[in-house]
Regions:
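A structural "domain/chain start" motif
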Residues: 2-71, 77-100, 160-162, 177-214, ...
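Acidic, Ser/Thr-rich low-complexity segments on the non-lumenal side of membrane proteins
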Residues: 165-176
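Long, contiguous hydrophobic alpha-helical segments, chiefly transmembrane helices and signal peptides
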Residues: 58, 76-78, 142-148
Length: 224
């Protein structure tokens, strides 16, 4: 019906948005210290490979990517937690819950319509046609939820006191407090959640997956 036509026009172009739950500000470094170690884990049931994309994104920015974390000045560790259909509300909720928080629900946003009442053959045919149009035009969202830990070496003579407390039932969500003090810690640690969302009429997963991966890679490489 009219709703399906409006959705088809409004959502004809693929739109991808990538957001972070928390802003992270890292100390600028000289080019000699632009060395990063990247490790990405995928704990979903989908075939997702974004580690190489993230590494290439850093290399294009002039960073040296190393396989030994002891050689790195920065460390990026990420876990792809969930990939699949969602809706705008679920994506916002998962983002607000932050690192280690709740994941997406099973909601899927789509345009649906109902048939007309039994008030005549013409009305019935029109209702069926409208229903068929509505079921063929679906407003599809796919999202990729990734928890990210970024580490940076302390500056010369900078001492870091770092404490961590798990407070979720699963022990996955944590807060980190840091103060410049006397204890010698190897890394300054920052955590955030990154969610990339793709939206388009009748969007297919394979097309969405490629764009979601690009969004995550671009977002993470932009941190340094």
């Amino acid at each position: 019906g009219c709703g399906a036509a409006a959705t088809a026009i409004e959502k004809r172009d693929l739109v991808v948005q990538t957001k972070m739950s928390d802003s992270i500000f890292l100390e600028p470094v000289s080019s000699q210290k632009q060395i990063v170690y990247v490790k990405v884990r995928n704990t979903t049931d989908k075939d997702i490979e974004i580690e190489d994309q993230i590494k290439r994104a850093f290399e294009l920015k002039g960073f040296k990517v190393v396989s030994n974390p002891d050689e790195a000045y920065f460390m990026i560790q990420a876990n792809v937690l969930q990939v699949g259909k969602t809706d705008a509300t679920d994506s916002d909720s998962a983002l607000k819950s932050g690192f280690g928080g709740g994941l997406l629900g099973a909601g899927v946003s789509m345009a649906t319509g109902g048939s007309g009442n039994n008030i005549g053959i013409g009305a019935a045919i029109g209702a069926v046609a409208g229903l068929l149009a509505d079921t063929m035009v679906k407003d599809i969202y796919y999202s990729m939820v990734t928890d990210v830990e970024i580490r940076q070496r302390p500056a010369i003579n900078e001492k870091i006191v770092q404490s961590e407390e798990n407070y979720s039932d699963q022990g996955t969500s944590s807060t980190i407090s840091q103060n410049v003090n006397t204890n010698d810690v190897q890394w300054k640690i920052y955590r955030t959640r990154v969610i990339s969302t793709a939206n388009q009429v009748n969007l297919q997963f394979e097309e969405a997956k490629a764009e979601l991966s690009k969004g995550i890679a671009k977002s993470l490489s932009g941190l340094l």
